Amino acid sequence: MAKSPARRCTAKVRRVLSRSVLILCWSLLGAAPAHADDSRLGWPLRPPPAVVRQFDAASPNWNPGHRGVDLAGRPGQPVYAAGSATVVFAGLLAGRPVVSLAHPGGLRTSYEPVVAQVRVGQPVSAPTVIGALAAGHPGCQAAACLHWGAMWGPASGANYVDPLGLLKSTPIRLKPLSSEGRTLHYRQAEPVFVNEAAAGALAGAGHRKSPKQGVFRGAAQGGDIVARQPPGRWVCPSSAGGPIGWHRQ
């Protein structure tokens, strides 16, 4: 029995949709990570240094904590910009020499104690030497320590994050995530982020972006990573039936 024109049309539409879903999956799993990794951070000391003190998030923000990592170095060692940015501070802060950089997407990184070799307003990139490491960081057990910090937002209301979670050497993959209201719970006990480059790659793969903000912010809570979403969110169909997002693996 011959199929009616309506049924033939429906079957054709289904085939086209199936191919579209396959293309979406390949672009999501293949292209997006490569673009995202291009904008992740590099080590500010070379070769990659020993981490002598880890990040310890304060909760809430005004409580004591360690809002960065301490990296072992030597006095006078060159300190590099961790990525493309603009210098927003270079000088003394509370008697300590500090350099602060603003990266695309709202991320800021800070470096201390560093005697600046750059000026405010100067654009820098990963190969740029921004200053020389000085001795005297409190609690440092090495000849000198670089305190490297990272934060989202302005200093007055900054959300401090572990800069080690932003390094290019940290592999990232796409995985389906469980959702509870407007909070995504990640299985890994480390920070997770979506930066502007990753956001652009995901948008190219058919995702929707918040009109106000394209960044997930992560924080460790009870062994889970909880990424609170901005208004709107990135969403994409998955075989697990949940949204897909970035996380460390």
Curated annotation (Swiss-Prot):
Leader peptide range in chain numbering: 1-36
Keywords, ordered alphabetically: Signal
Disulfides per UniProt: none
Keyword Signal: yes
Pfam families in UniProt: Peptidase_M23
Residue span of region Disordered: 227-249
Molecular function terms from GO: metalloendopeptidase activity
Protein name per UniProt: Uncharacterized protein Mb2915
Entry-linked CDD domains: M23_peptidase
UniProt-listed PANTHER family: L-ALA--D-GLU ENDOPEPTIDASE, PEPTIDASE-RELATED
Residues passing through the membrane, by range: none
